[in-house]
Amino acid sequence: RMSRGLGDVYKRQVYQKVEEGRENVAQYELIPWVLGQCANLQEVRKLLAKMNLVGTPFGDFPAAQLHWIIADASGAITLECTKDGLQVYDNPAGVLTNNPPFPMQMFQLNNYAGLSPKQPEHRFSGQIPFTSYSRGMGAMGLPGDLSSESRFARVAFVKCNSVSGDSEKESVSQFFHILGSVDQQRGCCEG
């Protein structure tokens, strides 16, 4: 079973021009084009090697600034179009948000390497008694703002540490709870 996602990327995608002898695919056709031909990530990687992703407008709309995540049971990849062509990144976090570019999002996860779903061990000083006064204190420092960068860190932490149930119904429910960790309520984020 394959899945896909996409995010809008603010004016940094660089699509290629149509090339003779290559499979030219418009950015808005990428996901159905891939899912119509591939059953797993291995097949996706082979197919992408033959493709030229172009910035064809959709009707009167300009070419959408998109990047993509494609996943199967074996893992996930992220696709971004840059001035150097289509970049295919392994995505061990299995999540994606708008900005910054994917390699930077992954690098910035280093800022949260000390976070844990477990209660923290007190290492500050043996001279000061500490008391954990709430569950979830191992995740203190996890960003809570609505920026793409913060949502990436938060959803990566939640996805990588959450536990799904044994049934498909429980797993689908957990999927929506993970998405809920990065909800943006109307009016809280202008622009």
Spans of model-derived segments:
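Single conserved hydrophobic/aromatic residue that forms the stacking wall/gate
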Residues: R1-Y10
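Structured loops at beta-to-helix junctions and adjacent beta-edge loops in soluble globular domains
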Residues: G7-D8, A71-A73, T82, V158
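Compact, glycine/acidic-enriched structural inserts
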Residues: K11-N52
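A short, polar/proline- and glycine-enriched secondary-structure boundary/capping micro-motif
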Residues: R12-E19, V88-A93, N99-P100
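Glycine-rich loops and low-complexity Gly/Arg-rich segments
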Residues: A26-L30, A93-L96, P103-M106
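Aromatic- and glycine-enriched pocket-lining scaffold segments that form the walls
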Residues: N40-L41, R45-C81
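C-terminus-biased signal that marks the final domain/tail of proteins
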Residues: P57-F58, A63-A64, A73, T97-G191
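Aromatic/basic-lined ligand-recognition segments
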Residues: A76, E80-G85, D90-P92, N110
